[in-house]
Amino acid sequence: DYPVTYTISYPSGPRCTPTVHGDRVYTLGAEGSLICFEASTGSIQWSRELKEDYSTKAATWGWASHPLVDGDRLICIVGTDVAHAAAFDLDSGAEVWRTGTASEQGYVPPSIVTGAGVRQLVLVKPRGVYAVNPETGQLLWETPYDADNGSIIMAPVRLGNYLYVGGFKSKNLLLKMDQKTPGVEVV
């Protein structure tokens, strides 16, 4: 048993794993409430409402892709036709960059791999897989992927020079990462 000094409630409950970094906890609720808490007290440091900020609606199962901390940024899947992903300043919650568009959010968490000596933020959306520079959001490569709406859930898995993207209803994708320049080839 552990003492509980505070509790937090969300409409529709959270579906994302909280992200803990230093003395902060970052949560993303099912309806798009992105909140930064002080870990020891539960006091809110900043918050954003992704549904309003990105003029979108929750996917069928709500926001369910946990945020990723990279340096001084918190990277999230945010919406659809306005932006697919965005990075926020860890301390203030201010948007640092936004990138991509998608027919639906999907549920795949952002992940970082290194290929061709370059750090690449890999993002999966219902009709494609793409990578951007995690510091700027600038597109590095993109390949089509018909994942049957937003039903993709698992994070891409890297093995050697290959990147495996698992979908739904047998729609999987194997990519070979170029070792000279950021890019991929469908295998």
Where are these regions (language model features)?
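Short loop/turn segments that connect beta-strands within beta-propeller blades
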Residues: 1, 38-42, 49, 89-92, ...
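Extracytoplasmic beta-rich repeat domains
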Residues: 1-19, 47-69, 79-82, 96-118, ...
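Extracytoplasmic
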Residues: 13, 29-31
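Residue-level signal for tight coil/turn positions that link beta-strands
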Residues: 22-23, 31, 41, 71, ...
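Ligand-binding pocket scaffold of soluble enzyme catalytic domains
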Residues: 27, 34-36, 58, 97-98
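WD40 beta-propeller blade core
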Residues: 35, 86, 130-131, 173
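A sequence/structural signal of beta-propeller blade repeats
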Residues: 75, 84-88, 95
